[in-house]
């Protein structure tokens, strides 16, 4: 550590430890990790990502493998992302896209929700709209073009060759296109059709609706008299409703489904088996997934069987989360544990992963987020409430408490360093023949450098004391 001028402690070039004020240490990959100002500053390079942040105000990360440059400003309030010569950003309700930052005439968008929309579409056509007064908006909500004037008085949309006109939304609408037709005077009457696949209509919605279906392998029709009853019969299935949606019976081949009433009692038999007394208790089984709950959504169990993996999850929301992933052999038998994860919210989280080189584990306290590994939180917020952290991987261990008031770093059996800032620190570097200790960041210190003993007094006095 570069706290005293002589090499009485096993510092390497660029390393320093001033507790929560500033620290710099090499990780197992030989990359320098910097932290400072308590929880407010951090910078590191890991897994191909270069990162630095002033938490929670600003952070920036660059990943060379996928050419991604990501900036967060008071996340989730604002963000800027550049990738493959494209830029997207948001700040509050303002959003923007530039699809080629190297071309000033490229496709772009600017939205100031919910009032202003402008840009240039993929065909090079400019557009602008002010809601609700009027204008043209392209490439929005799955539509190629949208035009409105004094919404909801009038608007029209285009998607491929399908054109829709609407007056006094949602009352009058008329849609026409290749193999598509829709018309409504809501709620009095409406009809729609798609190719030769189906035809639907309603009268005095939602009280009466009906449809005819001519899908290949599934033909028939049905009706709904809401809220009294309904019936649908196709060539491969049949469904009855009584007081919809409360009571329902459906049969589709070997599969049956019953609501008695929905959502409280739900029962299914066949390839998918299910029984719910919601929200008190329930279970569901498919070929590869089994779930169970009690007092939903508090107690949840989920098991997933895949050809090469088993995933087990247990939740006592929002307090306890546990997950285990196990590997299988060619016969489908579980033979090893690949990873585990547990969280006792808001106190701690612990994860462990087994890789080709050994086991990597990570412990963090506190853990205020009820969600797991949310990128924006990890980049901008979690360091603020991380009072203690322990990371271990093959050949490397790092422990930090109170943002560096206590820190311990181990690299194999050759290097170790422990600091209780600003009281005492000690360490050893076998490769460089260094070891030593110091009190008060140099008030008193003793160490060896390549076998030569040295004494440190009053921060400035450097006294050789023999070999």
Regions flagged by a language model, labelled:
Residues 11-467:
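Outer-membrane beta-barrel proteins and related beta-barrel translocases across Gram-negative bacteria
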């Amino acid at each position: 550590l570069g706290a005293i001028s002589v090499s009485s402690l096993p510092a390497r070039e660029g390393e320093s430890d001033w507790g929560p004020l500033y620290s710099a240490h090499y990780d197992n990959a030989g990359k320098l990790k910097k932290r400072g100002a308590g929880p407010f500053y951090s910078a590191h390079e890991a897994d191909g990502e270069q990162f630095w942040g002033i938490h929670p105000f600003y952070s920036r990360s660059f990943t060379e493998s996928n050419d991604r440059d990501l900036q967060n400003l008071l996340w989730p309030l604002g963000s800027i992302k550049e990738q493959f010569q494209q830029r997207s950003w948001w700040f509050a309700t303002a959003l923007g896209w530039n699809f080629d930052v190297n071309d000033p005439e490229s496709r772009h968008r600017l939205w100031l929700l919910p009032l202003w929309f402008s840009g240039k579409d993929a065909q090079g056509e400019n557009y602008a709209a002010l809601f609700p007064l009027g204008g043209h908006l392209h490439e929005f909500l799955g539509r190629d073009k949208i035009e409105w004037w004094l919404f909801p008085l009038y608007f029209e949309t285009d998607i491929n060759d399908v054109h829709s006109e609407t007056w006094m939304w949602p009352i009058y609408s008329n849609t026409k296109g290749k193999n598509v037709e829709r018309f409504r005077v809501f709620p009095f009457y409406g009809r729609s059709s798609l190719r030769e696949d189906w035809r639907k209509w309603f009268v005095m919605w939602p009280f009466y609706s009906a449809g005819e279906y001519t899908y290949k392998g599934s033909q028939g029709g049905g009706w709904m008299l809401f809220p009294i009853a309904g019936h649908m019969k196709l060539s491969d299935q049949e469904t009855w409703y009584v007081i919809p949606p409360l009571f329902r019976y459906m049969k589709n081949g070997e599969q049956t489904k019953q609501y008695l009433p929905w959502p409280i009692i739900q029962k299914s038999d066949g390839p998918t088996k299910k029984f719910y007394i919601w929200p008190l208790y329930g279970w569901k089984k498919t070929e590869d997934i089994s779930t169970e709950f009690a007092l939903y959504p508090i107690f949840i169990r989920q098991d997933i069987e895949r050809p090469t993996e088993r995933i087990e999850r247990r939740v006592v929301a929002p307090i306890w989360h546990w997950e285990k992933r196990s590997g299988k052999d060619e016969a489908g038998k579980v033979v090893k544990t690949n990873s585990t994860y547990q969280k006792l919210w808001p106190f701690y989280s612990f994860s462990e992963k087994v890789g080709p080189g050994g086991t990597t584990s990570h412990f963090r306290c506190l853990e205020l987020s009820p969600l797991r590994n949310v990128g924006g939180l990890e980049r901008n917020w979690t360091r603020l409430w991380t009072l203690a952290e322990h990371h271990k991987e093959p050949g490397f261990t790092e422990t930090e408490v109170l943002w560096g008031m206590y820190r311990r770093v181990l690299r194999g059996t050759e290097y170790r360093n422990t600091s209780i800032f600003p009281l005492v620190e000690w360490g050893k570097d076998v490769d460089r023949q260094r070891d030593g200790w110091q009190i008060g960041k140099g008030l008193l210190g003793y160490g060896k450098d390549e076998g030569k003993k040295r004494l440190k007094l009053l921060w400035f006095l450097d006294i050789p004391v023999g070999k």
